[in-house]
Amino acid sequence: LSIAKITKEFYPDSIVDDFDSSVKNISKTSFKKKVKYGLNVLIGKNVKIGKNCLIGHNTIIEKNVVIGSNCSIGSNVIIRNTIINNNVNILDGCIIGKKGFGFFPNNDQNIRYPHIGIVIINDNSEIGCGSTIDRGSLSNTVIGKNTFLDNQIHIAHNNKIGNNCIIAGQVGFAGSSTLGNNVMIGGQAGISGHLKIGNNVHIGGGSGVIDDISDNTKVMGYPAKNLREFLKNNR
């Protein structure tokens, strides 16, 4: 914690001053003070962006998106149907707010389930490079406050991720699960759909979660089991 505080003083998250601001394809947009953006940025109608924000090169922000203050949006990012609150970092290559993967089998064809929800990313959170977050179908997909996602994570439609969570790279969530607060998930774990995972849960890397998990539990393995049981059976 001390190292984090010290390095933040010497290496602050600053807004780069050498961005080309001659972007042509910006529609009617509500910008506040000190918004800087790179080359080939496209911003749709009725987008709202708070003060002290940075938008990287080749990024697309589609109509009606809301971005709070002190946010950093990386390069090659696509954002649609999303509300981003304050002090949020979206790293390079993320796609946020696209339609989820939901279909009705109907005779010889699959009919896509409607997705009329949005994505909400709350204050002080970070979404790692190359991650994808699908918008909700009939409800919203939500990322809690002070939650950090590593690179190449997939969050499917309708998931609710709590506050103060840390999720390592290549974790995948199926749809409509709820994650409590202070949850830690190791890399390449998979979370099945329609589950309830409690507060203060630890999920080991590579685990497959197919059942609900109660508060203050540590699990590992496939299917994920109580950590003590897993270690006892895998010595």
Regions inferred by a protein language model and the residue ranges of each:
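Phosphate-bearing ligand-interacting subdomains
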Residues: 1-18
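Structural signal for interior beta-strand "rungs" in well-ordered beta-sheet cores
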Residues: 25-26, 30-226
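Long, leucine- and charge-enriched amphipathic alpha-helices
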Residues: 225, 229-235
